[in-house]
Swiss-Prot record:
Coiled coil: none annotated. CDD domains: OMP_decarboxylase_like. Keywords: Decarboxylase, Lyase, Pyrimidine biosynthesis. Pfam families: OMPdecase. The keyword Lyase applies. It comes from Roseiflexus sp. (strain RS-1). The active site is at K93 (proton donor). Its EC number is 4.1.1.23. This is Orotidine 5'-phosphate decarboxylase. The gene is pyrF. GO terms for molecular function: orotidine-5'-phosphate decarboxylase activity.
Length: 272
């Protein structure tokens, strides 16, 4: 199955378009876990085990593992190998010249064996091609990110009046989606941008961070991001789920929070 087919099959099976971001901050983890690579692994593995039937994907952020050096990389490898069912999106935001991109793509798809990766389009199509040619894997292109500084570049207007983020979306649709394995990252903190991107790309997967701690509104986001037939939107939540409790019952608390979010997403889909 292709990445898109895997996501949709998982979403149907789990009745969920929730994606849990695995962004483990050691100082916020349960106090009984060590603040090292092994603690991060144990924390994320427990979250995955507790919520695997409630999500359409997991998204580990590579930076939180790289921060521990070789031990962190090993922890990430082992975490991806767990594969409790939902696909794994490696949040790496890679983007570099051809030969470097080739190495990044091998690391993501052949070494770590992630199902998808986030990529940065700033260097253009030749920096994305090494990832895109892995036709069974997914590539989520940064389009309109959830951080406040996204306005600095992504909202710049081109000569024809389009914002840069919309040009990226249209380029992804027309030039980079030759294998049907391309998606877009669009932040929940920018509902107008989500609406514009969805209108331009009605059949592409959207990965939507920014709900919860970053302030994105769930109902507004679902209305803007959901496609007509199948939703094709992966609502990513991290801190709200990960740090629902700092005690020994943290995994159960994460499950309760994930269940609430999954049901809220489904209710918003029904109400649109």
């Amino acid at each position: 199955m292709t990445f898109r087919e895997t996501v949709c099959a998982t979403a149907r099976r789990n009745r969920s378009w929730l994606c849990i971001g695995l962004d483990p901050e050691p100082m916020r983890m349960p106090v009984h876990l060590p603040a090292d690579a092994e603690g991060v692994y144990a924390f994320c593995a427990a979250i995955m085990d507790a919520t695997s039937d409630l999500v359409c994907a997991f998204k580990p952020n590579i930076a939180f593992f790289e921060a521990f050096g070789a031990a962190g990389w090993s922890a990430l490898e082992r975490l991806i190998r767990l594969r409790p069912g939902p696909p794994i999106i490696l949040d790496a935001k890679r983007g570099d010249i051809g030969s470097t991109a080739e190495a990044y793509a091998r690391a993501a798809f052949e070494v770590l064996d992630a199902d998808a990766v986030t990529v940065n389009p700033y260097l253009g199509g030749d920096a994305l091609e090494p990832f895109l040619r892995h036709s069974q894997r997914g590539c989520f292109i940064l389009c309109k990110t959830s951080n406040p500084g996204s306005h600095d570049l992504q909202d710049m207007r081109l000569a024809d009046g389009r914002p840069l983020y919309l040009a990226v979306a249209e380029m992804a649709r027309d030039r980079w989606n030759m294998h049907g394995n391309t998606g877009l990252v669009v932040g929940a903190t920018h509902p107008t941008a989500i609406t514009e991107v969805r209108r331009a790309c009605p059949d592409m997967l959207l990965l939507v961070p920014g709900i919860g701690a970053q302030g994105g509104d769930l109902d507004t986001t679902v209305r803007a991001a959901a496609a007509v037939d199948e939703p094709l939107m992966m609502i990513n939540v991290s801190r709200t789920v990960l740090y629902a409790d700092r005690g020994t019952n943290f995994a159960a608390a994460a499950r309760t929070t994930a269940l609430r979010l999954r049901d809220a997403i489904n209710a918003a889909l029904m109400a649109r």
